[in-house]
């Protein structure tokens, strides 16, 4: 099956339309390619679009590339895409793999729609006789640089990105017999959802999930670095908006080997979940890190997260070689939980406002005695309080306002009792 290239433009029927594009062993390989000025309009109905691609010899693979307009109309529509980067040829790096690359307008209309995309980076080549292995390619599930709108309805967006593994440098058994022979290639970066535009799910009980798995660096010789894993990345100036409904945003980042860097949600833009009882969950896991040199943050960045009205939950966790980290947030991010009985779990360099309602702060990663508390004034929960943790001589401060209950590993306090013991 060949690449489906638009134009020629496509207008569907009022029934259930199906479009499939597949391109294998090409460089670059693109399953469905909508060019600037091109459009796909499938009108109403339960429509299905599928794009599959595999690059060759280190070439890139993109399941669906949209630089024009893709509109599936009203109805419960499904868009699926797989983009595999090609493995590196001798001496080369693996190619990048992207499930959906949108720099135009992608609109699924009203209805309970589903978008799923997988991007796998290619493996770096193996080099013998003391050479350097190729680096793994980057993998991105959904890369949105334009407008992505799923309209009204209970919509689901899922992106999974796997970085390619680095190639061996020298003999594959060099870690056993010749420890300093060759240098392994680095693993590629894996990002589930990378948003540099507008991602809007409209009203409804929506779910956005991103999983990013960094590629590994092979052992043997001088070991390369493991690739970063980022579940959801929302850059400066970009927005993720889920509007009214019980929405869930989940970012899972995974990485392994030396210099592991992992983020569940990396937000430098704005994430707004709108009204409703919403959940935002960021989890970062690093394994087999050299001398525990991994960097893991459940939620990180310099942006803003707003959950508006409703009984909302935000949870940030980081796990390094099986050990839950006490510091799971970073970058100085600002979080506003709005009105409602909210729950927040996590600690790090951030400012968190519980807003109005009976809000709970979960600090069960710490005993009460491990944190220095300042700024607490009895009867005034709106006064900014600061929790400070001494991390190997490095003080880490966490600023909060508007919380009424505080849970530690060994105790729990109301605001007034915490103030009395601050």
Show which residues each predicted segment covers:
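Collagen triple-helix signature
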Residues: 58-61, 78, 85-97, 114, ...
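Extracellular beta-strand repeat scaffolds in secreted/surface proteins
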Residues: 49-51, 77-81, 115-117, 157-159, ...
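Structural detector of coil-to-beta-strand junctions
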Residues: 29-33, 39, 61-63, 78, ...
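Thr-biased low-complexity repeat/linker tracts and other Thr-enriched repetitive architectures
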Residues: 60, 69-89, 93-120, 138-155, ...
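N-terminal segments that cap or nucleate solenoid repeat domains
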Residues: 1-62, 67-68, 72-77, 242
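Conserved consensus positions within extracellular tandem repeat modules
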Residues: 15, 24, 43-45, 73-75, ...
